[in-house]
Structure formats: structure tokens, C-alpha cells
Amino acid sequence: MANPSVKTVTIYLIEDDASQRDSIESLLVYKGYIVKSYSAANNFLKNVPFERPAIVISDICLPDISGVELYQALIEKNINIPIIFISGEASIQQSVDAMKQGAIEFLVKPFEIDELINAITKAIHIELKEINLNLLIENLSPREREVYKLLLKGHNNQELIDKLHLSLPTVKQYKSEVMRKLNVKSLSKLIELSK
């Protein structure tokens, strides 16, 4: 996959109110985004898998399942993409629940256009960072991926030696290769990159 850019990101919009959906879609298309819109979560879920890079903008209150349930369904399908929730009738608890699930932003209608664009920009940045990291990880050998995953879990050299049945020089070599291929200079930068 070539390096994706901001304008190649598909925005999936799930909004049951037709006038709201059309208004948001028109605005985003005018701004140059690729938008695919749906009136219900299940209609959207039927189209999985979909193109990446992508982000989702979803109303919390949908006719079939809630926006949070939609996001949980995506996670269950191993589709972890940034989501922005919108709602005209949001409670504080809904907002908290959405953010705990991993929402990038929770906007209450009516929201300012700048609020939406800022949330989209943030979500796209997160999505592109994730895709670029995945491209780098694809360049790791299977053993380097094992080392990478263990490093992210906080394992030290001795634990890597024990778990992977390798010598200290070999562990150090794998760590060095992982950091070189992921273009980081320190373990803390490796962990930061993967957040």
C-alpha cells in the first residue's frame, strides 16, 4: 500500500436524520473528503470490509443499534478505526461511555463546523499514524515482530532471553533491528510510536 494522504481517507458517516446526514456529507464533500453515508449502523456494518484509511462519524442514537454498539461491533471484527460520535441528545454518561470505548471526540449538536473539522483532522492523523506504523511492522521478520510485541509489554532483555530462548547478543541484535526498521532511537520512543 502506498503512503496514504489526508484526502484519500474515506469518511463513513452514520446518521439517521436525513437532513443532518445530507448537510454533513455536503460540507465534507465540499471540503474535498471522500464520504460514504448510511442511515443505520447495520447498513454500514454489512459493507465491512471497507477501504482504509478510514474514519467513522456516527450518531450515538441510531434506529437499530447505538453508536457505541456499532463501535464495539467494529472492534469485534478486528477493525480498529478512529470514530467521532455526534448526538443531539447526549447525556454526560453517554459521552463518558463513548470516550471509554475509544472515541476520538464526542460532539453535541448543533456543533460548529470548525469543531467537526478539528475532530476529523485529529482522527485522520491517528488513522494515518496507525497505517504507517502497520506498514513499518510489516517489514519486520516474524521473530522481530515477537521481540517488538514483548518490548511493548515491558519485557527486559532477560525476559526476552527466557521467552524466546535466545542468547543476549541475539536479543540485542533483534532489538536493534526492530528499532532501526521502525526508525526509533530508544525504547521509550518505540513505546510512544505504538500508542
Segment roles from a protein language model:
Residues M179-K195:
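Basic, Lys/Arg-enriched C-terminal extension of HTH/homeodomain DNA-binding domains
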Residues D59, S87:
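Active-site residues of response regulator receiver
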Residues V68-N80:
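Short amphipathic alpha-helix used as the core "switch/output" element in two-component signaling
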Residues P63:
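The feature encodes the CheY-like receiver
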Residues A40, S66-E69:
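Acidic catalytic/metal-coordinating carboxylates
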Residues V9, D17-K36:
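Two-component/phosphorelay signaling modules centered on CheY-like receiver
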Residues S91, F111-I120, E159, K163:
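C-terminal output helix
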